[in-house]
Regions:
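N-terminal secretory targeting modules
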Residues: 1-75, 79-86, 96, 129-135, ...
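Conserved SGNH/GDSL esterase-like catalytic core that processes O-acyl groups on lipids
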Residues: 71-73, 79-160
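Soluble or luminal CAZymes and related metallo-dependent hydrolases
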Residues: 86, 115-120, 165-172, 200-204, ...
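Active-site segments of SGNH/GDSL-like serine hydrolases
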Residues: 140-144, 174-208
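Short glycine/proline- and charge-enriched loop/turn segments
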Residues: 153-161, 233-240
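A short acidic, glycine-rich active-site loop
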Residues: 158-169, 241-246
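Catalytic His-Asp segment of secreted/periplasmic serine-dependent ester chemistry enzymes
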Residues: 193-273
Length: 273
């Protein structure tokens, strides 16, 4: 597989940004390019939670899933890609279990905001065909905006995309919401990461809920304390490669069941096709 491969079933990417090692660890971009890529893969393969038994291709398909036959877009960065889980994330587990087709537009280290290259906004406009038919559009609330201290911005009184400052978190989210509503006309779902030590990301989560009131999108809130409280410290250490990125086991046994339950509800309530 190349660093960035995209087709109807899967797409993935890695960042080419120049970052310090500390930033790389947080952003999930370590090993994304050059010789570091092989080192990253070897390091991830040694993690118990990434053992072959947890691979997505060993996941059994469910019968009569509400998501079966759906077409779902996933937009995100390293957590959506699966940077610490050998390129497999909740996307592959959900698709394998539920029998839907998908596009995964995920590039490690990228931000929602256009303040940095290869942003969510830019890739949504340039890489996702506006004529494609999607039943759901799922977008990650990126931790990279928090790590890079992208300005939060303010909620606009306007619904016109030209009025949104996409160099801010708020403007980027509003732009995505407006764009999805115009071109794909399907339910939009944002998902957060599980709780870690970041006041800035906590502010982004709060902002996301405020924007929900304006735009009416759905939120799968993994940041909620109850999600972290649902696993023991021992399980957490097994499920998470670092405070941001799950292992294969973390996606399969922790994140996927939560996301699946919420996507079932959303599909049953809002998907007409």
């Amino acid at each position: 597989m190349t660093d960035r491969q995209k087709k109807i079933l899967t797409a993935a990417g890695v960042t080419g940004a120049t970052l310090t090692l500390v930033q790389l660890g947080l952003l999930g971009a370590l090993g994304g390019i050059g010789p570091l890529k092989g080192l990253q893969k070897a390091r991830m393969m040694r993690k118990p939670g990434n053992a072959a038994e947890y691979a997505a291709d060993r996941t059994e398909k469910l019968e009569n899933s509400p998501l079966e036959g759906k077409r779902i877009a996933f937009l995100g960065s390293s957590v959506t890609y699966g940077a610490h889980s050998l390129g497999e994330s909740f996307v592959e587990y959900l698709a394998k279990r539920n029998g839907f087709t998908y596009v995964k537009e995920a590039v490690s280290g990228t931000t929602l905001a256009t303040k940095y290259p290869r942003s969510y906004v830019d890739r949504m406009r340039n890489e996702l065909n506006p004529k494609m038919l999607f039943d759901l559009f799922v977008c990650q609330l990126s931790t990279n905006d928090a790590a890079r201290k992208v300005p939060l911005g303010a909620i606009s009184a306007s619904f016109d995309r030209n009025d949104f400052d996409t160099d801010t978190v708020c403007g980027a989210i509003e732009y995505i919401a407006s764009y999805v509503a115009e071109y794909w006309r399907c339910p939009l779902v944002f998902y957060t990461g599980t709780r870690f030590d970041s006041d800035r990301y906590a502010q982004m989560v709060q902002l996301l809920f405020e924007l929900k009131d304006k735009w009416g999108f759905e939120i799968i809130d993994l940041w909620d304390d109850s999600v972290r409280g649902s696993v023991t410290d021992e399980q957490y250490a097994f499920y998470m490669s670092d405070p941001v990125h799950p292992t294969r086991a973390g996606y399969r046994d922790w994140w996927t069941p939560i996301m699946e339950k919420e996507l079932y509800r959303i599909a049953e309530e809002k998907c007409s096709r």
